[in-house]
């Protein structure tokens, strides 16, 4: 019988730490439900003790997920473990994940303890977690730079204390494949009680080795891989879920293992994470990059036409990638739009059909032809002006010539009925529009990030603008999508300002409660 490798997804914990602006609870839940459909065995969804917001998002996800084990991170500290339990206890199935640093560098410089103390703390943490659940994972942080004797010692102690999964992370992406594989082999051979736990690996990609290290670890006895969608994560990122899963699937002859992942969901989840996290996917990224299945050289194209196996080791359909249909126009009905979304594997619960269809009609009128990737962008950027928004972009025009500075006219609708207008100059049309909007709202805002991405191809491609603005020490994220860059920039700022207004509203409600 083929051995199964457990896929532990940490997109919403280790992946989210790398983002410029935090995801909302709604966005996190959307990703968690997509991960559940993907078939991940375990999803790590936050660090509950770190903030009330993180605690609440872990609790919300724990309440909704039925077909995967939900876990949260905690240091080897009582209050962390207790907070993790309180957030997770509503889940159908949960795990507590606790960790402590084990390398000499961390033990001496960060913890300022002896290694004996660290082993004692690990044992106490695992025992406390076992009071709450039979499923406890222990990680020795920075194992890649820890001596093998110390790794074996702390792992044995953690298993004796009740750990059911022991994780050997290469926290700083320092190891090379043979070296890391050897660490796993030694843990497997030298720890006397290792048969009572699953060996897990968690690799970072600082030297580009995360996928290779994870696969080598599996060949040496690891049976859980910790990874993220698109490999997102701190610094150079984490092991990429899609890469390790497809490597084990395509090379099952060599690896001799499989996973529970429904690979046809990979493309969809990858796109969702990219858009919600504002993390573009490099075109030549393995498995999910836009060029991953493109064959532009004449020789390759000729071979592909004769027999696609000449240059293709897996079919695009395996990861849920379908050829784009070109038949969506302004004349297409709601059923056609819904049908295209269903073809891409989305359920009606994943998006608001009414809002999507309205946005689709506006885009189809401008563009003529609408592609599947356009629909995905419209469906999952939940920001084009909704009912609850205080501010709506009503009219916009911007002019710029070589001789004269740029000027912009902006009309906004405030609170559903009040029209406010401003005409002002700026250093280019986008700057002029931003000056006009800020002039109307009177908010003090500092732009800390502006990114423009083309969605689609050709002159009529959609321009997606992602911004992060700072207001009173807090960061707010805005996204705008339109065929015109100035319009998408304006929509992004209006989106961010609406988020600020919502934050003000929440603050007012809280203040009210305290008085």
From Swiss-Prot:
CDD domains: DRE_TIM_IPMS. The keyword Lipid metabolism does not apply. InterPro entries: 2-IPM_HCS-like, 2-isopropylmalate_synth_dimer, AIPM/Hcit_synth_CS, Aldolase_TIM, LeuA/HCS_post-cat, LeuA_allosteric_dom_sf, LeuA_bact_synth, PYR_CT. PROSITE patterns: AIPM_HOMOCIT_SYNTH_1, AIPM_HOMOCIT_SYNTH_2, PYR_CT. It is found in: Cytoplasm. It is an enzyme of class 2 (transferase). The keyword Metal-binding applies. Residues 392-515 are annotated as: Regulatory domain. One of its GO terms (cellular component) is cytosol. Mn(2+) binds at residues 14, 202, 204, 238. One of its GO terms (molecular function) is 2-isopropylmalate synthase activity. Keywords: Amino-acid biosynthesis, Branched-chain amino acid biosynthesis, Cytoplasm, Leucine biosynthesis, Manganese, Metal-binding, Transferase. HAMAP family: LeuA_type1. Catalyzes the condensation of the acetyl group of acetyl-CoA with 3-methyl-2-oxobutanoate (2-ketoisovalerate) to form 3-carboxy-3-hydroxy-4-methylpentanoate (2-isopropylmalate). Homodimer. This is 2-isopropylmalate synthase.
């Amino acid at each position: 019988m083929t051995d199964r490798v457990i896929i532990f997804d940490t997109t919403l914990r280790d992946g989210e730490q790398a983002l410029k602006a935090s995801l909302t609870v709604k966005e996190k839940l959307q990703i968690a439900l997509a991960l559940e459909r993907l078939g991940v065995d375990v999803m790590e969804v936050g660090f509950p003790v770190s903030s009330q917001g993180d605690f609440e998002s872990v609790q919300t996800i724990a309440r909704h997920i039925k077909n995967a084990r939900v876990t949260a991170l905690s240091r080897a500290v009582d209050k962390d473990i207790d907070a993790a339990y309180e957030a997770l206890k509503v889940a159908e199935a949960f795990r507590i994940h606790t960790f402590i640093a084990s390398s000499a560098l961390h033990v001496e410089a960060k913890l300022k303890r002896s290694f004996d103390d660290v082993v004692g703390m690990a044992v106490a943490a695992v025992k406390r977690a076992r009071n709450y659940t039979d499923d406890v994972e222990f990680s020795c942080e920075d194992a890649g730079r820890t001596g093998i004797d110390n790794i074996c010692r702390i792992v044995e102690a953690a298993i004796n204390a009740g750990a059911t999964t022991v994780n050997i992370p290469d926290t700083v992406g320092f190891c090379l494949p043979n070296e890391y594989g050897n660490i796993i082999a030694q843990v497997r051979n030298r720890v006397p009680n290792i048969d009572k736990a699953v060996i897990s690996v968690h690799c970072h990609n600082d030297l580009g080795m995360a996928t290779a290290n994870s696969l080598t670890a599996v060949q040496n006895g690891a049976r859980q891989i910790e990874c993220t969608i698109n490999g997102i994560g701190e610094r150079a990122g984490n092991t990429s879920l899609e890469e390790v899963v497809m490597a084990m699937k395509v090379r099952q002859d060599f690896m001799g293992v499989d996973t529970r992942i429904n690979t046809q969901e990979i493309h969809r989840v990858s796109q969702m994470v990219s858009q919600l996290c504002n993390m573009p996917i490099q075109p030549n990224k393995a498995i999910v990059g836009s060029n991953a299945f493109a064959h532009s050289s004449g020789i390759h194209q000729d071979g592909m036409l004769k027999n696609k196996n000449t240059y293709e080791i897996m079919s695009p359909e395996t990861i849920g990638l379908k050829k784009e249909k070109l038949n969506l126009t302004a004349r297409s009905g709601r059923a056609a739009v819904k049908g295209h979304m269903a073809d891409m594997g989305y359920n009606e619960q994943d998006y608001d059909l009414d809002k999507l269809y309205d946005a689709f009609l506006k885009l189809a009128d401008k563009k003529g032809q609408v592609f599947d990737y356009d629909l995905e962008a419209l469906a999952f950027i939940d920001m084009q002006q909704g009912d609850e928004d205080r501010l709506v972009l009503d009219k916009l025009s911007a002019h710029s010539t070589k001789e004269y500075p740029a000027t912009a006219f902006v009309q906004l609708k405030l609170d559903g009925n009040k029209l406010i207008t401003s005409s002002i100059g700026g250093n280019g049309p986008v700057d002029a529009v931003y000056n006009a909007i800020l002039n109307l709202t009177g908010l003090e805002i500092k732009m800390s990030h502006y990114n423009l991405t083309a969605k689609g191809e050709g002159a009529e491609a959609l321009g997606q603008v992602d911004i992060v603005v700072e207001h009173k020490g807090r960061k707010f994220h805005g996204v705008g999508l339109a065929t015109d860059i100035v319009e998408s920039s304006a929509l992004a700022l209006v989106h961010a300002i609406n988020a600020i207004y919502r934050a003000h509203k929440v603050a007012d409600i809280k203040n009210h409660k305290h008085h």
